[in-house]
Amino acid sequence: MKIAVLLTCFNRCQKTLKALDSLYKAAEVFNEKNSMKLNLEVFLTDDGCTDNTSSNVKKAFPDKNITIVEADGNAFWAGGMRLAWNKALEYHNRIDFYLLINDDAQFLQTAFDEMFKTHNYALATYKKGGVYTGFIADEKDTNKIIYGAKYHKKAFLSKTYNMMPKNMPQECMFTNANFLVVDKHVVDEIGQLSIGYKHRDADWDYGIRALKAGFPVLTTYGVCGVSVNDHDSYKQEAEKGSQDESQGPQTISEQAPARIS
């Protein structure tokens, strides 16, 4: 099973090394207990790093399949991710999934279990693969979810609310790309990240586009990794709304918005 791992980096070498190390270890754990074997191929955009990110990554993982895409420091997050994805698309025929990650996350050894449990749920429930966003917890308090998915309860332009794990996949609207899985058939239909975004929100837009194209957009069952919490936790933000509003949408059809790209 070939997974193209996409990330973009700017002067966060040590975090990038930890992120990749944790991801490789998660794949090893998955492969040890499953007959289906994962083959990760990393496409990393070096957006003008001055901390030797690329060379250190190559040195740390000499036996891994890693492609470095050079940028000039002006790609920013969305631009850097598009560059990495464009390179991966050259090998689209041999890729089964695209996995978008953030370089400041560290992934749990169960991350790929979460991915494939969610994928199997999508196949059983919707008869097709889709887009799956993994919950990321605060590394200092794993009860606090800091990235994952958001939704609108009512009108499209109303306030968004954060979602919490419920030990089962949940339909969602806005996706964070800290651990974002995209089935290749989604890419066949809608392509990659929109060129209309330079830095943030391109991952939100992608979930909406997939949803509008008729693909399931789901959270994972549980947490896939941890990261530094430099935002309000999902739980704290959700508490600013009503308890009812924090429950999330019941069906995709209730939440289908107009395309914003």
Question: For each of these PLM feature ranges, what is it?
Answer:
Residues 12-33:
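Short, well-formed alpha-helical segments that are part of the catalytic scaffolds
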Residues 94-106:
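Short beta-strand-to-loop acidic/aromatic patch adjacent to the donor-nucleotide binding site
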Residues 130-146:
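Short beta-strand-to-loop element that shapes/binds the nucleotide-sugar donor at the catalytic cleft/hinge
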Residues 161-182, 249-251:
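A recurrent flexible, glycine/aromatic-enriched loop bordering the glycosyltransferase active site
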Residues 174, 180-182, 186-191, 196-223:
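A short, conserved alpha-helix in the catalytic core of glycosyltransferases
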